[in-house]
Structures are given as C-alpha cells and as structure tokens.
C-alpha cells in the first residue's frame, strides 16, 4: 500500500475514535442535567452516577479481552470495525428508551461490549501497514482521537442537550456515529493483501484457532508491567473525564455552556503532547520508552495535587492543562511497546488483553471517586484517586525500564 493510502487509514481510525469518545462522554455531561437525573432518579447520588460509567467499562473491558481474539482470528479488522460501528450506534439510540436505571445500566454495558475491540483493531491495522521503527507516529496520531473526542464531545453534547433535550441528543449522536463511522471504515480502512484478515482458510476448528491466538497474546514478554501502566493510564482518563464536568459546575460555578468548553480545554492540550510523545518514540530506543511513564507520571501527579489545592481560577486552569499535557505524552508508548514484543499474528489480541483488563480495573475508578466525594463533601477530593493512578504509572514505568535495560545488557553480553 502506498504511503498516502496507509495514512488515510490512520486518519480514518483517528476520527472513528473521535466519534466513539464523543459518544462515551455524553453520560458525564448528562450528569449535570436535572431532567436526566430526575428521569433516572439519580439526583444527589454520586456513587450511582459513577456506576453508569463503571458498567460501560466493565462491558468494554470484557469485550476487549475476550471478543478480540475471535474478531482477529475470524473477521479481520475491517469487517470487525463495521460490525462494531453498527452495534454501538443502535445501542446509543436505545439509551433514552430505557425505563429505569437498571435498564440504562444494561444498555451502557452492552454499549461497552460493542466498543471494546476498537483499540485492538486499530493496533492491528498499524502493525499491518507500518514497520517496527515507524509505528510511534501512527500510534500517536490515531490515539489523538481520544483527546479530540473529549474536546469535541463535551461541547457537542452540551450543545445538543441544551437545544434538543437530553433524550434527542442520544438519537442525534447515534445517527452521526452510524453515517460517519461506516463511511470512514468502508472508504479508508483496507487490509494488506497478505494480512491475517485475508489468509487462506485454516482447516483447524474455529475454537482451536481462537485459543491459539489468545495463548500467543498471553505469552507476550513484559505483558504484566505494560498492563499495570495501562490500568493507571485508563484510570486517569476515565476518572478525569467522568467527573470534570461536575467539578466545573458544582464546585466552581460554571454554567453548562461554559462547562462544555472548559472541560474540553485540558484535552486540547493533550493533543499536541500525544503527537510529541509519538515523535519522541521514533527517535529513542525501545528500552528507553518506559522513561516517558516515569517522568510523565510524576509530573501529572504533581499537577493534579496543584488542582486540588489551588483556589484561584488561573492556577486551577494551569494545573488542569499541565496535567493533561503530561498524561498525554505517555499515550503512544503503550501500543508501541506492545507492538515491539507481541507476535504479529496476535498483536490485536495482546492489546485487547491489556486494554480489556485495564478497563475492567479502571471501571471502578469513577465510582470510587464518587464515594470519596460523598464522604468528603467536595468533588475535588476525589481527584486523589487520579494522583494514586499516576504514582502507579511512575513505579511500573521504572520497573519496566529496569527489566528492559537488563534484558538488553544480557542480550549484548
């Protein structure tokens, strides 16, 4: 595939992640809408509000971990992405039809299942089309979709909710996801002629082939340390995106319209920092990549501490922006390290394992933050959980660097 064509696929995946994340954050914005809270009897119950994000992430994590090997073995990334887009659009449209909190939680969990394999499929595409020393930038560019999705999602959902009501905003998002998502996948995401998605049929039974892929993924070197970093990274992402709107409106007094743009600003900063991290990865040796987690984790933790203990708006804005910049620079290092170690035929499933387990653990972070807030009486008090996540990033990154450096020295001896 020509240079330009393979990058068209990366850009398409970027925008696919954008619309997926815009769809995910709608619940965080809904939690400041009195009509939505009254409809599902959620007013004043921070723990149950956090549960809406938790059940989504539980479905997401299980799907990323268990469904990805089937998709990688049997469908390939193009057909699997098509199926995923259709399912998550239908489930988004069904969300306001839930007549109770329990039914809404079920729909949210199924939505998580439909979106779970997305990053694994994205990782498969990049491994398919880019050499080992070229993957830092495409990993970073496609991962920009996380920040762009949050940047666009917060003000977009706020606008739709303010002008069309909370229920109609779900339907409009579903239509947007379906039309744009299918167009992106069908026009720009194509497998290589010799990729795993177009190999001759394997005579082995389906379950044997899937289990073989799954087993190869589990045997990826350094998987445990990369997994710890993924858990910490996702804990920060889901914790901050779930509670930042409530922090700005309930604790700092912003209107819903102002909140939409203010909540997006930190993630705008992380767009540039993620690309910077990807460019850096292509210039350093693989064993040096974990140092990004060490310095990035320490800096992010310090900035969140500054958010919690600042009272002037200028300092709060500075620390929020700096925290997301330091967190964003770490983004591309996780898939790049995994692509370095995983077997080519199981790279999607290996990423599915860490992404799935990472989301299963981080699923409880919004709820845990809600419980801390309920006990302390302030939204900002829950940000202590984010500090803990970044300290874990620092420690796991340091351990991973030591092991990779030792392995390099042994290999050279």
Feature locations, PLM:
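Helix-to-loop junctions at the C-terminal end of transmembrane segments
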Residues: 63-76, 275-286, 373
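Cytoplasmic helix-loop-helix junction between adjacent transmembrane helices
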Residues: 107-147
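Extracytoplasmic gate region of multi-pass secondary transporters
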Residues: 28-29, 221-275, 331, 335
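Helix-loop-helix hairpin linking two adjacent transmembrane segments in secondary transporters
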Residues: 142-192
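Conserved MFS/SLC helix-loop-helix module at the cytosolic interface between two early adjacent transmembrane helices
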Residues: 62-99
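Juxtamembrane intracellular "pre-TM" segments in multi-pass secondary transporters
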Residues: 1-2, 192-226
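Cytoplasmic membrane-interface "Motif A"-like loop-to-helix N-cap segments
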Residues: 73-85, 282-296
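C-terminal transmembrane helical hairpin of 12-TM major facilitator-type secondary transporters
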Residues: 287-334
């Amino acid at each position: 595939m020509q240079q330009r064509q393979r990058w068209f696929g990366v850009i398409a995946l970027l925008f696919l992640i954008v619309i997926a994340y815009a769809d995910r954050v709608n619940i965080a914005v809904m939690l400041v809408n009195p009509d939505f809270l009254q409809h599902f009897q959620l007013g004043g119950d921070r723990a149950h509000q956090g549960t809406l994000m938790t059940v989504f992430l539980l479905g997401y994590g299980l799907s990323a971990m268990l469904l990805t090997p089937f998709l990688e073995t049997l469908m390939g990334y193009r057909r699997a992405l098509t199926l995923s887009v259709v399912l998550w659009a239908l489930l988004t449209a069904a969300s306001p039809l839930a007549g109770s909190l329990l039914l809404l939680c079920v729909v949210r969990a199924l939505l998580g299942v439909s979106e779970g394999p997305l990053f694994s499929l994205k990782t498969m595409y990049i491994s398919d089309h880019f050499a080992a020393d070229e993957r830092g930038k495409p990993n970073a560019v496609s991962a920009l979709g996380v920040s762009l999705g949050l940047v666009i999602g917060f003000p977009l959902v706020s606008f739709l909710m303010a002008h069309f009501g909370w229920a109609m905003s779900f339907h409009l998002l579903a239509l947007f996801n379906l039309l744009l998502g299918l167009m992106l996948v069908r026009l720009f995401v194509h497998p290589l002629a010799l990729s795993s998605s177009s190999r001759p049929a394997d005579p082995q039974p389906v379950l044997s082939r899937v289990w073989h892929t799954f087993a190869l993924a589990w045997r990826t070197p350094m998987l445990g340390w990369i997994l710890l970093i993924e858990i910490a990274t996702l804990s920060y992402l889901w914790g901050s995106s779930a509670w930042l709107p409530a922090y700005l409106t309930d604790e700092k007094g912003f209107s819903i319209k102002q909140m939409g743009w203010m909540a997006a600003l930190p993630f705008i900063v992380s767009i540039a920092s993620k690309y910077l991290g990807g460019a850096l990865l292509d210039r350093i040796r693989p064993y040096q990549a974990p140092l990004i987690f060490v310095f990035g984790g320490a800096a992010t933790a310090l900035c969140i501490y500054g958010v919690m203990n600042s009272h002037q708006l200028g300092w709060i804005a500075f620390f929020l922006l700096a925290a997301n910049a330091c967190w964003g620079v770490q983004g591309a290092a996780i898939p790049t390290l995994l692509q370095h170690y995983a077997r080519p035929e199981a790279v999607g499933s290996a990423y599915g394992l860490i992404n799935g387990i990472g989301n299963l653990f981080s699923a409880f972070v919004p709820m845990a933050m809600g419980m801390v807030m309920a006990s302390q009486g302030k939204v900002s008090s829950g940000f202590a959980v984010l500090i803990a996540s970044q300290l874990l990033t620092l420690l796991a990154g340091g351990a991973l660097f030591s092991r990779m450096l030792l392995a390099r020295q042994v290999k050279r001896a």
